Structures are given as structure tokens and as C-alpha cells.
Amino acid sequence: MSKITLVLTMNYITSKIAKEILNSQSEEIFLNLDLNKTEKKEKILIDREKKIAKFPEGDVSFDILKKIAKDEGHIYFIKDGEVFKAAISNNGYYKLVPTIPPTIEINGIRMHRTKEVNPYEDTLNKINAVKVKKGEKVLDTCMGLGYTAIEAYRRGAEVITIEKNPNVLELAKINPYSEELFKGGIKIILGDAYDVIKRFKDEEFDVVIHDPPRFSLAGHLYSEEFYKEIFRVLKPGGRLFHYVGNPGKKYRGKDLQKGVMERLRKVGFVNVKRVEEALGVVAVKPRD
């Protein structure tokens, strides 16, 4: 269990930003450089003689900006005067996708819904499904970029979040929308939720939010054994939200939500219901 502090001093460049700079006819341009997390605009000086754009965090050549302009699928950032791609190639390919707010993509699979809703709206649907309240203790089993943990914390909950993949944790450190994760108020545990959950005491949490990778990637997090552990760590009356995915889609001919609901009931959960807008299931640990 750790508290990680982080200070983000980066300028972010997307294809759109690069195009605006290259197409500008002025010697300076004011643009948002924090992926629209705020409305703040920064001054960028354009030196056509030297073919560079002077950002607050460093100079970027026109050649690099032209490459970024053609790459609509990635986010780039300037740190300590150098330009980096917000992507990691290590046991797979991990990248931040320039949605607002960003989502994370692992080997071509996006970890948030980005079509019907944006990642922030997706998060609100999950949090609202279990009505997180001030003073409650919340376990977020699969951190990702931490939007769920952050929203629960903003509502006054004590939050512990688990992330298995160090690459995901590194991308969260780059993402400005994840900054609140690293300010010390949210506890982060690096490990597999299947194992980490066994460390917690009986009846420790008011709420568990379980948003695992898809079944084909993390079947053990959909198992009856794992659901028993969730049931154990929840207080009587405690609530679970379990993201499952689109109920209209089936994995190898099986209705995943139906199977999840059956296993949750089998381990003792009651009031097990589908939550269509959040593409998941809610359940309650009985008080008796």
C-alpha cells in the first residue's frame, strides 16, 4: 500500500494542437495545453526562421509537429524540454487516447466507453449506481486511470484502489486527469485484485466498485471464488457495482451479465440487478 506524490509540469500536444500551430499565420498563439482539464491557455511563440514552436516547457521543431499532426491516435507531451509519446511498449502496447478525458488503450482495446458516453460520464454512471456517500470506505478493484477512485474520493469517501499493471500506473502518472490519484488522499496498491483482496479484513468496506478487464483477459476476476472475497470484505448492507460490458453482446454464446448475476447470488448477494446505463450489475450484501 503506497501513497505516491506527483507534480505534473507538462505541456500536452495532440494532432489538433500541432495543426493549429502549423497553420497559424501569427508569431504567437494561445492554446490549451492540459487536454482541456482547465480553460487555461498558454502562449506559444512561433519562430518560422528557426522552424520551432516555443512552448512553456520547451521548444518543438516543425518537423516533430508535422509528425504529431498526422498522428490522431496518440497524445504527446513535453517534459524537461523533450517531446515524448504517451505510450509504453512493454509486454504489450499501452497508450493514452486523446479523448476528453483520455482513456487508456491496451493492445487496441479501450478501457473506457468512448462512443455513447465519454470516460467521465462512464465513471459517473458507475459511481451513481452504488450512490457513494461521504464517510464511506470504498474499494476500487481495478484502478486504470483512476477516474472511479477520484470521483469516489471527491464525494468524501475513503478510497483504496488496486492496479495490477505497472505500465497502466505509469500512464496514469502522465495523464493530467489522473493527477488527484497521486496527491496522497487515495491509497494505491500495485497487485492483482484477486490476491490483494485477501489481505483485507472481513466487513471492511461499504462499497466495492469492480470494473475488471474483459472476461477473455481476466476471467479469474469474474469467478465465484473472487465474488466470495468481495462478499467477505463488504459490510452488511454494503453495495457492489460490477461492470460487465454491453448486455447485448455475448462471449462464446454466453450472456456474461446473466452468469455474473447467478454467481453473485450463489455467494450470498441479494437485490442483484442489471444497470443498463452503466453496462453493469449492482448487488447488496444482506444485513442479516
Swiss-Prot record:
One MF term in the entry's GO annotations: S-adenosylmethionine-dependent methyltransferase activity
CDD domains tied to this protein: AdoMet_MTases (cd02440)
Superkingdom of this protein's organism: Archaea
Pfam families noted in UniProt: Methyltransf_11 (PF08241)
Gene3D superfamilies given in the database record: Vaccinia Virus protein VP39
Protein name listed in UniProt: Uncharacterized protein MJ1233
Organism: Methanocaldococcus jannaschii (strain ATCC 43067 / DSM 2661 / JAL-1 / JCM 10045 / NBRC 100440)
